[in-house]
Amino acid sequence: DFQRLFIEIVLKHVELVLKAPNAAAVPPMRLMLLGTAGTGKTQSVKTLLQELKRALNLGHYEGHFVRVAAPTGCAAFNVRFGATTLHCLFQMLRPNKFAELREDSPELAAFQEKMRATRLLIIDEISMVGKQMMGKISSRTCQSKNSKDNPGDDILGGISCIAVGDPAQCPPIMDTAFFDPSLHKDTLKEPDAIRVK
């Protein structure tokens, strides 16, 4: 069962991260969970979050190890588990006025504290996230993890990321998709047994 495989891969990675002496000791995981509508992507994420909570005793997600976000409030609400919008999580509330948080500012200190324990980011409805948005997310996560332990020069500040969605669904608004959906059209038609080896 591919849902179980997905969950086992993530649980194993999280276990390694929790046992590591510092954040930089385990390379971040980059995982895409793609499928057409109704294939169980969101249910897989919900099951994963329940498993993480139970197996690793992570407690409440808000402000902790796992952050779940989506481009829209509706998508975030559908996942639950403390999910929020990407704009809210990464303090991008003025769409055309993105700027780095100033060094030594109270805003940056508060953001770093909020993200301090975060080691796994789950982004739902990834088809709606464009190159510019992903760049802003990476910029913010790098700012949140900038320390002598983790210089924050890795994409996403060294935070593991699971991107979930249907590449053939809604494209980003006023942005360019950061992956080419046409490359995935044939893949999404293949039987699961052929894709997962």
Model-derived segments and spans:
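Conserved ATP-binding/catalytic motifs of P-loop helicase motor domains
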Residues: D1-K197
